[in-house]
């Protein structure tokens, strides 16, 4: 939870973790409201409040020894970026590592230069796609489920991490189920109106879950029946 003094507090995923031991963390913030605008406009030296981290993480340890598929849509690339960096740093602990990342247009791609570097790294299999793009766009055009559907996977040995708009996550998870992955090996990062961060206020309730405590990362075996309930 990030707090802009005198304005308010918002939940925010970590998009970068320092590797030099200084404890620094990074956040990727899109200015869409009063708090995010204040944080977006903050200058070096500005003091901000930080609480957490709260809830569940991607549990990358459970993927050790397995193939790993990371699916990111839009701003969803930011929360999975530390996973990609960690998987590369510990590359020998995993089988294949695959990234499918998409955005509405090339201009909406987060960390695009870094994504291009990942695509050029022989230790990663990367598919980049934009929903719409001009003739100069060298990657795929279309939604993320299209390159995801073309992947050849070993379902019993594959884990998947998905982050992005909820509709994109549902369709991506369904694509992976059709390819034979088990729901418990597919994890999503869910969003609701998180406020307290410790499971007290109930604003982030999704059925029996309080996402600040039981999420935001949830197995699809748990999430699927909840996401099928209208207006939940």
PLM feature segments, named:
Residues 207-232:
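Non-heme iron-sulfur electron-transfer modules
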Residues 167, 190-216:
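Local cysteine-cluster metal-coordination motifs and their immediate loop/turn environment
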Residues 2-4, 50, 206:
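A generic structural signal for residues embedded in beta-strands
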Residues 1-46, 103-105:
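Ferredoxin-reductase
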Residues 34-195:
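FNR/FR-type flavoprotein reductase catalytic core
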Residues 27-29, 126, 188, 204:
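Preference for bulky hydrophobic residues occupying beta-strand positions
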Residues 3-5, 18, 90, 117, ...:
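Sterically constrained small-residue positions within well-ordered secondary structures
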Residues 9, 20-22, 63, 196, ...:
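A generic fold-level signal
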């Amino acid at each position: 939870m990030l707090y802009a003094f005198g304005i308010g507090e918002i939940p925010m995923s970590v998009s970068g973790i320092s590797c030099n031991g200084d404890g620094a963390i990074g956040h990727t913030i899109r200015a869409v409201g009063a708090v995010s605008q204040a944080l977006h406009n903050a200058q070096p030296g500005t003091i901000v409040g930080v609480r957490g981290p709260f809830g569940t993480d991607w549990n990358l340890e459970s993927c050790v020894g397995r193939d790993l598929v990371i699916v990111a849509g839009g701003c969803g690339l930011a929360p999975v970026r530390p996973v990609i960096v960690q998987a590369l740093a510990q590359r020998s602990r995993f089988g294949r590592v695959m990234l499918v990342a998409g955005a509405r247009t090339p201009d909406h791609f987060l960390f695009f230069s870094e994504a291009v570097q990942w695509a050029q790294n022989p230790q990663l299999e990367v598919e980049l796609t934009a929903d719409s793009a001009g003739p100069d766009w060298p990657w795929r055009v279309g939604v993320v489920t299209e390159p995801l559907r073309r992947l050849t996977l070993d379902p019993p040995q594959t884990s998947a991490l998905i982050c992005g708009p909820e509709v994109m996550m549902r369709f991506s998870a369904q694509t992976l189920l059709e390819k034979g992955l088990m729901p418990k090996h597919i994890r999503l990062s869910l969003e609701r109106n998180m406020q307290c961060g410790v499971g007290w206020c109930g604003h982030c309730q999704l059925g029996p879950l309080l996402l600040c405590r039981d999420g935001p990362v949830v197995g699809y075996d748990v999430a699927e029946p909840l996401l099928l309930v209208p207006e939940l």
